[in-house]
Amino acid sequence: MHRMEQRLEIEQFICRSDNYGVLIHDPESALTATIDAPDAYAIEAALERRGWTLDFIFTTHHHLDHVEGNEPLKEKFGVSIIGPEAEKAKIPGIDRTVKGGDEFTFGLFKVKVISTPGHTAGGISYYLPDAKVVFTGDTLFALGCGRLFEGTPATMFHSLEKLVALPGDTALYCGHEYTQNNARFALTIDPDNSALKERAKEIARLRAHERMTLPSTIALEMATNPFLRWHDRTIRARLGLQDAPDEAVFAEIRKRKDMF
């Protein structure tokens, strides 16, 4: 089967309180990876549901709620743990380090590493172009972006620029189910955006039934996520930043979210 025809299977679930667990599986090679390891028990349960065994952990950043399952999963499955070079000292059990611009293979799929610091100093995202999917950890959320624990607004802005350069039909998976709260904030920044208003209603319907709001797409985020709409004239006018650099518009939106 030609690579472009091969389907990546994805199993997504909520764990801890609001973390997303995400397993990816290549049926051709029977390889399975988890994007981060927030909860070993939840990941094991998902593997059992699907009849998969775990081969890899792809770590996006070092925060405990993304790596706490590393060592128990490694002990049980003998997985190989891949993670950011810049954070290797903080990632339990890491076997292989990668950095922005690196590529490796996962079964039939090419994995491109994108350097996306800001939330942490060395955070990365994993992009699988043949599957049209990107895993952004806590850098880009549905209708939001990560808090700047170890980076500056400029750092995060440049990371987001890399992600919005991906094809619009790229599916987005991120680290947390924060979407409904993000929608409430987004409407304070971009209240006249009809696409955002409709999306907020759909998110409310989903969450009322405890359903997941992801995946999103890069195109949907560019149309509705205020953290990616630094170019929008209406938003700029609302912020009083009509002629400001894009980076300054983003920084003001991030500042307002921190106080929301």
From Swiss-Prot:
Source organism = Brucella canis (strain ATCC 23365 / NCTC 10854 / RM-666)
Co-factor binding details = Binds 2 Zn(2+) ions per subunit.
Named from the GO MF annotations, one term is: hydroxyacylglutathione hydrolase activity
Alphabetically ordered keywords of this record: Hydrolase, Metal-binding, Zinc
Which GO BP terms sit in this record? methylglyoxal catabolic process to D-lactate via S-lactoyl-glutathione
Write out the catalysed reaction: an S-(2-hydroxyacyl)glutathione + H2O = a 2-hydroxy carboxylate + glutathione + H(+)
Write out the residues that bind Zn(2+) 1: 61, 63, 119, 138
Q: In which pathway does it act?
A: Secondary metabolite metabolism; methylglyoxal degradation; (R)-lactate from methylglyoxal: step 2/2
Give the protein's function: Thiolesterase that catalyzes the hydrolysis of S-D-lactoyl-glutathione to form glutathione and D-lactic acid.
- Which SMART domains would you find in this protein's record? Lactamase_B (SM00849)
Amino acids binding Zn(2+) 2: 65-66, 138, 176
The molecule here is called Hydroxyacylglutathione hydrolase
Tell me its EC number(s), please: 3.1.2.6
| Gene name, Swiss-Prot/TrEMBL | gloB
Assembly mode = Monomer.
The record ties this protein, via CDD domains, to: hydroxyacylglutathione_hydrolase_MBL-fold
List, alphabetically, the Pfam families matched.
HAGH_C, Lactamase_B
Q: Does the keyword Hydrolase belong to this entry? A: yes
Task: Tell me the NCBIfam families matching this sequence.
Answer: GSH_gloB
Q: Which cofactor does it need?
A: Zn(2+)
The record's comment on protein family reads: Belongs to the metallo-beta-lactamase superfamily. Glyoxalase II family.
